[in-house]
Amino acid sequence: MKEDIQPKYGDMTATCSCGNVIKTRSTLAKDIHVDVCSECHPFYTGKQKVVDSGGRIDRFNKRFTRRSK
């Protein structure tokens, strides 16, 4: 078998925008930042909240309400 062909497998940290920190192991060499996690996602929490990134919903509604008039 060939030696040293496997990627390096080390510790990494995923930080959520809600402040939750998840420590795991991965071949990814750097820490990452995520928008939602299991602590703040509406499916897991049971609370309904709108995750609107940059007013996309408003732009969509504005664009298609003009056409329907």
Curated annotation (Swiss-Prot):
Cofactor: Zn(2+)
Cofactor: record remark: Binds 1 zinc ion per subunit.
UniProt cross-references to Gene3D superfamilies, sorted A to Z: Ribosomal protein L31 (4.10.830.30)
Annotated GO biological process: translation
A Pfam family matched in the record: Ribosomal_L31
GO cellular component, one term: ribosome
Keyword tags: Metal-binding, Ribonucleoprotein, Ribosomal protein, RNA-binding, rRNA-binding, Zinc
SUPFAM superfamilies found in the cross-reference section: L28p-like
Residues that bind Zn(2+): C16, C18, C37, C40
Keyword match RNA-binding: yes
GO MF term list: metal ion binding; rRNA binding; structural constituent of ribosome
Lineage: superkingdom: Bacteria
PANTHER family for the chain: 50S RIBOSOMAL PROTEIN L31, CHLOROPLASTIC (PTHR33280), LARGE RIBOSOMAL SUBUNIT PROTEIN BL31A (PTHR33280:SF6)
Description of how the protein assembles with itself and partners: Part of the 50S ribosomal subunit.
Family stated for the protein in its record: Belongs to the bacterial ribosomal protein bL31 family. Type A subfamily.
Role played: Binds the 23S rRNA.
Protein name listed in UniProt: Large ribosomal subunit protein bL31
Originating species: Teredinibacter turnerae (strain ATCC 39867 / T7901)
Taxonomic path: Bacteria, Pseudomonadati, Pseudomonadota, Gammaproteobacteria, Cellvibrionales
Gene name in the database record: rpmE
